Amino acid sequence: METPTPRVKPGFNGVGVGMGSSVNGSSRRAGYYMGPAGAVAVAGGGRAAAAAPVDGCSVALRVFVLAATLVSAVVMGVDRQTSTIRITVTDALPPLEVPLTANWSYSSAFVYFVVANAMVCLFSAAALAACRSRAAMVPVMVGDLLALALLYSAVGAAAEFGILGERGNSHVRWPKVCNVYGRFCERAMAAVIVSLIAAFANLVLLMLNILTIHKSSSYY
């Protein structure tokens, strides 16, 4: 009987333990690898499929992005206000009172904002479900990059339209409307701010994912 010869193999963090032995001419190998997700057993001469390392901070950020984008999409999606506008036709006639409605769907920027936040919310839910799959790490990272670009573009478009409604544009004689639709503008502003915070959280999440893939690259 041969004496078992220990073999050390690198794991995710360069730390691993292996044991090989040969009995009656047959070779057997067993061991385990230590990584961020714990010990991964390997036996029978093969390598077990390792689960992706799960970072609690990344999961918390993912849940926050999901919740924040959901809130932003819902708040903007129900934003609507009807106000009575006085219109003077001639000085000889009393002003006419006309009810006018401001709705988020009347602005293409706000429509894009709602759709973008809804898409990022759905992607965050799918990424949470796939967070333990090592094969999904790179696709999720690419998705995070696209989600980040989508959020920032949506926030920029909605913020620009909101500033136009708040201040108007004297160069083209566009009057401000937030003095008439105050509640509508406040809700839109709140949705944009929450979505901007979600975009920052998504940026941090993307950086953490890149760092995780870099640390575990020695496994391959």
Swiss-Prot record:
InterPro entries listed in its UniProt record: CASP/CASPL, CASP_dom, CASPL
Intracellular or extracellular location(s): Cell membrane
Q: What's in the keyword line of the UniProt record?
A: Cell membrane, Glycoprotein, Membrane, Transmembrane, Transmembrane helix
The record's Gene Ontology cellular component field reads:
plasma membrane
Assembly and interactions? Answer: Homodimer and heterodimers.
Q: Which residues are glycosylated?
A: 103
- Family to which the UniProt record says this protein belongs: Belongs to the Casparian strip membrane proteins (CASP) family.
Q: What sections of the protein cross the membrane?
A: 58-78, 109-129, 145-165, 188-208
Could you list which ranges are Extracellular topological domains?
Answer: 79-108, 166-187
According to its record, how does it sit in the membrane? Answer: Multi-pass membrane protein
Is the keyword Cell membrane assigned to this protein?
yes
Record's protein name: CASP-like protein 1E1
Q: Which organism is it from?
A: Zea mays
Side of membrane Cytoplasmic, spans: 1-57, 130-144, 209-220
Organism lineage string? Eukaryota, Viridiplantae, Streptophyta, Embryophyta, Tracheophyta
Q: Does the keyword Glycoprotein apply?
A: yes
Q: Domain of life of the organism in this record?
A: Eukaryota
